[in-house]
Amino acid sequence: MHLITQKALKDAAEKYPQHKTELVALGNTIAKGYFKKPESLKAVFPSLDNFKYLDKHYVFNVGGNELRVVAMVFFESQKCYIREVMTHKEYDFFTAVHRTKGKK
């Protein structure tokens, strides 16, 4: 799968150095993998969840559930864009904002 950019992961690795290994591993695994559908990605990342308020957005738990990585995943074209890496508290706010906007 083509990882469009690793900027969000690199920035997060600097901001949360205690989780750098997990963030790098996430990026490498996505970039080296072929994931035909969400179930195949979930087989590798059991914590993967669909972000129900935005189409094609998925959430990875990283660092023992301390960080959330929100990514747009296009299975048909095998592309992944890491949108944001955030703490659990920031993710709760992100969810609340998008819940009020409705699904897009």
Curated annotation (Swiss-Prot):
Gene Ontology biological-process entries: negative regulation of translation; regulation of DNA-templated transcription; regulation of growth; regulation of mRNA stability
Subunit-structure text: Probably forms a complex with the antitoxin HigA which inhibits the mRNA interferase activity.
Keywords: Endonuclease, Hydrolase, Nuclease, RNA-binding, Stress response, Toxin-antitoxin system
Enzymatic class: hydrolase
Induction description: Induced by amino acid starvation and when translation is blocked. Induction is decreased in the absence of the Lon protease suggesting, by homology to other toxin-antitoxin systems, that Lon may degrade the HigA antitoxin. Transcription is negatively regulated by the cognate locus, probably by HigA. A member of the higB-higA operon.
A cellular component term, taken from the record's GO annotations: toxin-antitoxin complex
Endpoints of the signal sequence: none
Role played: Toxic component of a type II toxin-antitoxin (TA) system. A probable translation-dependent mRNA interferase. Overexpression causes cessation of cell growth and inhibits cell proliferation via inhibition of translation; this blockage is overcome by subsequent expression of antitoxin HigA. Overexpression causes cleavage of a number of mRNAs in a translation-dependent fashion, suggesting this is an mRNA interferase.
Protein name: mRNA interferase toxin HigB
Family: Belongs to the HigB mRNA interferase family.
EC number from the UniProt entry: 3.1.-.-
Gene Ontology MF term list: RNA binding; RNA endonuclease activity
Species annotation: Escherichia coli (strain K12)
Superkingdom of origin: Bacteria
